[in-house]
Curated annotation (Swiss-Prot):
GO cellular-component term (any): mitochondrion
Encoding gene, per UniProt annotation: AGXT2
Catalytic activity of the protein: glyoxylate + L-alanine = glycine + pyruvate; (R)-3-amino-2-methylpropanoate + pyruvate = 2-methyl-3-oxopropanoate + L-alanine; 3-oxopropanoate + L-alanine = beta-alanine + pyruvate; 2-oxobutanoate + L-alanine = (2S)-2-aminobutanoate + pyruvate
Species whose genome carries this gene: Pongo abelii
Protein name, per record: Alanine--glyoxylate aminotransferase 2, mitochondrial
Modified residues annotated as N6-succinyllysine in this record: 71, 262, 304, 420
Length: 514
């Protein structure tokens, strides 16, 4: 594994000699009420790996003014992590810097979005060059970046997935995929898993099956949930179910080529087809690994059988690759490939543009024709020159810097290290995932698997932040830490993250004992 340009900048050093975690920068004036982070005892301060990047001096709004503007003018739905939300100022690769100059290791990458690193120099250079040439035109005119990108993206997908619709977000992509499925099948019913997140637009809210995203009013007509085949929290699961270096602590007596949990969940899927939808359906949406629900993996072989059942009912199979694509899972470039399936439609977003608004729907010529016969689909910003130039640069960086291989190597290493914490701490119920998409589920105890109360998970989350590590949250009760760093992450940085978690968990157990 090589990360070419980074090796030129950082030849040595795993840790700084005597770091001061989250050192305050007194030259920044953010108002008298801004206070230092919580002080931690000496034994809880893992050493942060070095970073040779110096952030610019912060010269914008004071922290208190930011809070006022947020309260007065921004949607109240826009909530932030932590009791004292971070005011982030600048990013460099896997690092983020706040307005006080404090440095954080970003292990959530903008909700699984910054794929090749914050402000990657090659991506930045391409964006700046395109910015000076052509920002926006329209798809009623041709421009090279769109066609160059389409050719590159199509080359990374198997036949017959070769027709590309460019849009701007995952919700847009999934809504278009819903429209395609219904236009092609002449049916209405679409199935998705409980715990699924496929967007927050009026139509995709029907596919999303998480209580906090549901309204009392009707929405997403024709969408039906089915049981999520969760081998840790669901009724069935064993010790060989997942395509992961780390399995659940649940035991089973399955032979190597057999999975009783998979068979039981398939029976539940058949039950949904028999009782909850029409004889002919439009389609089935599935994330290769559920993201927002806490990195939930299905039993091996489940999706393959489910796809066959859906097609037997006249439906199309849609893989939501918004979080799992572009090499993040390590073993394959596309998440659906890890299940040995070929979808009829693939949606992608987030990592496709490394944080620049961009998304795509890829399908077969036959399904694409079914849509255009029904309507003239148009998207003002979809396929704009800036997005396409950046998208091409992201694909080039993934290949040139072997980031898929890095995801496999470093991700497997990280999973095995976090699994040691599961064995060490009673409140770590499960460690799961593949490549650089990892979930750490917190429980009250391993036997009951009851979720650790939110306020306790919040404190562990705060402690990680105080030590310089940023991670995400997921699952129905927000009890799972979501780990999804940029694919440029290194093993020394993983070692730091594991030690931060160990320290935060130790502090939690000490608080419990008092």
């Amino acid at each position: 594994m090589t990360l070419i340009w980074r090796h030129l900048l950082r030849p040595l050093c795993l840790v700084t000699p005597a770091p001061r975690i989250l050192e305050m920068r007194p030259f920044l004036n953010l108002g008298a009420s801004w206070t230092s982070v919580t002080k931690l005892s000496l034994h809880t301060k893992p050493r942060m790996p070095p970073c040779d990047f110096m952030p610019e001096r912060y010269q914008s709004l004071g922290y208190n003014r930011v809070l006022e503007i947020h309260k007065e003018h921004l949607s109240p739905v826009v909530t932030a992590y932590f009791q004292k939300p971070l005011l982030l100022h600048q990013g460099h690769m896997e690092w983020l810097f706040d307005a006080e100059g404090n440095r954080y290791l970003d292990f959530f990458s903008g909700i699984v979005t910054v794929s090749v690193g914050h402000c990657h120099p090659k991506v930045n250079a391409v964006a700046q060059k395109q910015l000076g040439r052509l920002w926006h035109t329209s798809t009623v005119f041709f421009h090279p970046p769109m066609h160059e990108y389409a050719e590159k993206l199509a080359a990374l997908l198997p036949e017959p997935l070769k027709v590309i619709f460019l849009v701007n977000s995952g919700s847009e992509a999934n809504e278009l995929a819903m429209l395609m499925a219904r236009a092609h099948s002449n049916n209405i019913d679409i199935i998705s898993f409980r715990g699924a997140y496929h967007g927050c637009s009026p139509y995709t809210l029907g596919l999303t099956n998480i209580g906090t995203y549901k309204m009392e009013l009707p929405g997403g007509t024709g969408c039906q949930p089915t049981m999520c085949p969760d081998v840790f929290r669901g009724p069935w699961g064993g010790s060989h179910c997942r395509d992961s270096p780390v399995q659940t602590i649940r035991k089973c007596s399955c032979a190597p080529d057999c999975c009783q949990a998979k068979d039981q969940y398939i029976e539940q899927f058949k039950d949904t087809l028999s009782t909850s939808v029409a004889k002919s359906i439009a389609g089935f949406f599935a994330e290769p690994i559920q993201g927002v629900n806490g990195v939930v993996q299905y039993p091996k072989g489940f999706l393959k059988e489910a796809f066959e059942l859906v097609r037997a009912r006249g439906g199309v199979c849609i893989a939501d690759e918004v979080q799992t694509g572009f090499g993040r899972l390590g073993s394959h470039f596309r998440g659906f490939q890890t299940h040995d399936v070929l979808p009829d439609i693939v949606t992608m977003a987030k990592g496709i543009g490394n944080g620049f608004p961009m998304a795509a729907v890829v399908t077969t010529p036959e399904i694409a024709k079914s849509l255009v016969k029904r309507l003239q689909h148009f998207n003002t910003f979809g396929g704009n020159p800036m997005a396409c130039a950046i998208g091409s640069a992201v694909l080039e960086v993934i290949k040139e810097e072997n980031l898929q291989e890095n995801s496999q190597e470093v991700g497997t290493y990280m999973l095995l290290q976090f699994a040691k914490l599961r064995d060490e701490f009673e409140i770590v119920g499960d460690v799961r995932g593949k490549g650089l998409m990892i979930g750490i589920e917190m429980v009250q105890d391993k036997i009951s698997r009851r979720p650790l109360p939110r306020e306790e998970v919040n404190q562990i989350h705060e402690d990680c932040k105080h030590m310089g590590l940023l991670v995400g949250r997921g699952s129905i009760f927000s009890q799972t830490f979501r780990i999804a760093p940029s694919m440029c992450i290194t093993k020394p940085e993983v070692d730091f993250a594991v030690e931060v978690f160990r320290s935060a968990l130790t502090q939690h157990m000490e608080r419990r004992a008092k």
